[in-house]
Regions:
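Residues at the starts of beta-strands that form the adenosine-phosphate
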Residues: 2, 26-28, 105-106, 141
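N-terminal Rossmann NAD(P)H-binding glycine-rich loop of SDR-like oxidoreductase domains
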Residues: 2-23
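NAD(P)H-binding glycine-rich loop region in Rossmannoid oxidoreductase-like domains
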Residues: 3, 38, 45-94, 98-101
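Oxidoreductase cofactor-interface core, primarily capturing Rossmann-like NAD(P)-dependent enzymes
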Residues: 24, 42, 117-214
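Short, polar loop motifs at secondary-structure junctions
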Residues: 30-38
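Conserved Rossmann-fold NAD(P)-dependent oxidoreductase catalytic core, especially the SDR/UDP-sugar
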Residues: 35, 82, 86-130, 136, ...
Length: 214
């Protein structure tokens, strides 16, 4: 399987990247990012761009893959809706428009855990709008991953300070099932791209289920 991955310089994207590089089901990973990811591997190719919105349909480097793992994103904390919408809505939808052929690809979008019935929350409105729009793009499969706390993958370089706080909560959260390992998240994406899944919204327990299929 050949995949395009975004967000390799962030925590989630890097973890998924490392799982893909270690996983024998993955033949090639094209990392599309603004900066080098800091890893080297025979499977890995990097495509650096300063502006995702400047990428154009028909770009031969973005064609012929089996899946997109769109892990790029930012926190909504301290962001105005217009700013957050560009990163979490406009860019992923533009990226979905320029890769192809869509009918042969699976698009996986990293959304986030939360109550998606509370549309008065800015980040929920934006993420839900993105999820719904991706489902109408004509991909072979489109899945919205909603992970919560994730335990790091061995060898990760891009770790924000807040992750250490989350990890301190790990023993407690583990009791209630609100966590995944980064390896599980990556394996779940690979499984969804290969085999599909009955629902488009992939919650924490669905990630565990999908990861167990590999």
């Amino acid at each position: 399987m050949k995949v395009i991955l975004t967000g390799a310089t962030g925590y989630v994207g890097e973890g998924v990247l490392l799982e893909c590089l270690d996983n024998p089901l993955i033949e090639k990973v094209l990392s599309v990012s603004r900066r080098p990811c800091g890893h080297m591997h025979p499977k890995l190719e990097e495509y650096l761009t300063e502006d995702f919105m400047a990428l154009r349909a028909g770009d031969p480097r973005l064609q012929g893959y089996d899946a997109v793992f769109f892990c790029a994103g930012i926190s909504s904390v301290g962001k105005k809706e217009e700013q957050y919408k560009v990163i979490s809505h406009d860019i992923p939808l533009h990226f979905a428009d320029i890769v192809g052929p869509r009918e042969r690809m699976t698009f996986i979008y990293v959304s986030g855990a939360g109550n998606y019935n509370h549309t008065d929350q800015m980040w929920v409105r934006v993420k839900k709008s993105t999820e719904d729009a991706l489902g109408r793009k004509g991909f072979r499969g489109a899945y919205n991953f909603r992970p919560a706390i994730m335990w790091r993958y061995k060898g990760q370089l891009h770790i924000q300070k807040i992750q250490y706080l989350f990890w301190a909560m790990y023993p407690l959260v583990k009791l209630f099932g609100g966590w995944n390992t980064m390896s599980e998240v990556g394996r779940a994406m690979i499984a969804a791209a290969r085999d599909g899944y009955p629902q488009r919204e992939i919650e924490v327990q669905d990630i565990t289920t999908l990861a167990g299929r590999l």
